[in-house]
């Protein structure tokens, strides 16, 4: 049987996070889009930051986490899970990167699992009171259709009045010609403008291609509508990033 998650030799993001954890260096993050656009940043430390280093909207949103059981989707190095554990939550943290999960466990996340997002159907129904998708991880839904399907799965594994706290980035807030051209191409293909296909590179490791979904607030509201969830409000800051508070109905 095929193991879940990304094979080690293609786990570029996992190797990046593990290298930072072991060496306390600052390895660069390289993201390649399928049109050839490449972005470069040295923000790996961000995946390890405690709550004092989070954005204002993240800090405001996480204070609203409710209940006792929480699910951290795309947990990375465990910054969200560790914070919620400190507050007394029973946290399940999931990621599709073996080395990311190894890092999260090494940092003290008690229940970190190698579980791709699309396999959340394996989790017990009526379990979680809060679901967190920080780090622009609304993007892990990948596409409009996949988002609606997975939101319904999230509904099944959450309890009454559960709260989904999800961060995204409005792709329309850009003047970058390459991004605007990409969005027009998406429109011609019947995709949302912010549905991008990317892969991660780190040293000799090249990750698999995957779809990542960036949406405006209006686009998010339309996606969520009719899935058993409803956007309660948005927490915004200067710039394109925002956090949505989405309630189970």
Task: Label each region the model flagged.
Residues 128-148:
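A short SAM/SAH-binding and catalytic strip from SAM-dependent methyltransferases
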Residues 17-19, 159-221, 225:
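SAM-dependent methyltransferase
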Residues 147-160:
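A short glycine-rich, Lys/Arg-flanked "PGG" loop and its adjoining helix->strand segment in the class I
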Residues 68-76:
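Conserved class I S-adenosyl-L-methionine
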Residues 51-68:
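Conserved alpha-helix/loop element of class I SAM-dependent methyltransferases that forms part
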Residues 1-31:
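N-terminal auxiliary segments of SAM/dcSAM-dependent transferases
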Residues 108-119:
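Conserved SAM-binding strand-loop segment of SAM-dependent methyltransferases
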Residues 97-98:
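Conserved SAM/SAH-binding beta-strand->alpha-helix loop
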